Swiss-Prot record:
Family (UniProt): Belongs to the PanB family.
Keywords for this protein: Cytoplasm, Magnesium, Metal-binding, Pantothenate biosynthesis, Transferase
Classification of source organism: Bacteria, Bacillati, Bacillota, Bacilli, Bacillales
Recorded superkingdom: Bacteria
Organism expressing this protein natively: Staphylococcus saprophyticus subsp. saprophyticus (strain ATCC 15305 / DSM 20229 / NCIMB 8711 / NCTC 7292 / S-41)
Binding site for Mg(2+): D43, D82, E114
Gene Ontology MF term list: 3-methyl-2-oxobutanoate hydroxymethyltransferase activity; magnesium ion binding
Protein name (Swiss-Prot/TrEMBL): 3-methyl-2-oxobutanoate hydroxymethyltransferase
Note describing how the cofactor binds: Binds 1 Mg(2+) ion per subunit.
EC number(s) from the headed UniProt entry: 2.1.2.11
Cofactor(s) this protein requires: Mg(2+)
UniProt xrefs under HAMAP family: PanB
Transmembrane region(s): none
Length: 270
């Protein structure tokens, strides 16, 4: 498993960091086998594997359940778990209790929190010994306000994002995810910050990249964002399922090769 210090060294040495968002045991096993640096269990699991309309419906219990499965599948990969909507911003005591619960019960290496307004939360968690990854730019828990579109597209917003990035680093964030922002802005932030900056829809000059397992493999994807590249095609599984269905209906499956041939009924009826 790469440690946080080793991930930091990758940034210093200008070696790119790979991150994949995964949600269950089998996908985690594949990600670890591919030697990906980091796995993120994102609250996007709400839409991707639970069928919710948005990330807002995801609960702490959902995150713990899936992250524990991912950890079992990838025991040797740096693991980050999302803090879901409603699990932060109530009060300091409640927020910390949930942070400890997520961090402790999942065996994650860090938690991830969305938004520039959480600097005090980052400080509080850091003081407790919980590493926090910040997420700026397009933050899915706030799409009801900002929408699914590129962020920081004008001068004022770009300046604000730079200030926010510095602020979360100063608060103690160990890493930053930048989503859906202009590539030159992401490059500037990556260059100026000391912590690793992982981009998604933020160009190639960030310290690393993250994509969702299902997106990059075209696995039950209903909408593909502009910044997603398809590296494989799991949709062919539908063809396999259709073939299975047809062979069952046609009494072609199971065949002799898939059948236990020992004759037992004569013995049973004796």
């Amino acid at each position: 498993m790469k440690t946080l210090n080793q991930l930091q060294d990758l940034k210093v040495n200008k070696e790119k960091i790979s991150m994949v968002t995964a949600y269950d045991y089998p996908s985690a096993k594949q990600v670890e086998a591919a030697d990906i640096d980091i796995i993120l269990v994102g609250d996007s699991l709400g839409m991707t594997v639970l069928g919710y309309d948005s990330t807002v419906q995801v609960t702490v219990a959902d995150m713990i359940h899936h992250t524990k499965a991912v950890r079992r599948g990838a025991p040797n990969t740096y693991l980050i778990v999302d803090v879901p909507f409603g699990a932060v911003g109530v009060n300091d005591q409640y927020d910390l209790e949930i942070a400890v619960k997520l961090y402790k019960e999942t065996d994650a290496n860090a938690i991830k929190a969305e938004g520039a307004h959480l600097t005090q939360y980052i400080k509080n968690c850091s003081n407790m010994g919980i590493p926090v990854v910040s997420h700026l730019g397009l933050t899915p828990q706030s799409v009801g306000i900002m929408g699914y579109k590129m962020q920081a597209g004008n001068k004022e917003a770009a300046r604000q994002l730079i200030e926010d990035a510095y602020a979360v680093q100063q608060a103690g964030a160990v890493m930053l995810v930048l989503e859906a922002v202009p590539s030159d802005l992401a490059a500037e932030i990556s260059d100026k910050l000391d912590i690793p900056v992982i981009g998604i829809g933020a160009g190639k000059e960030t310290d690393g990249q993250v994509l969702v397992y299902h997106d990059l493999l075209n696995y039950a994807v209903e909408h593909r964002a502009k910044f997603v590249k398809q590296f494989g095609d799991f949709s062919v599984g539908i063809d396999a399922l259709k073939q299975y269905n047809n062979e069952v209906k046609a009494e072609q499956f199971p065949g002799e090769a898939h059948t236990y041939k020992k004759q037992i009924m004569n013995e049973v009826t004796e």
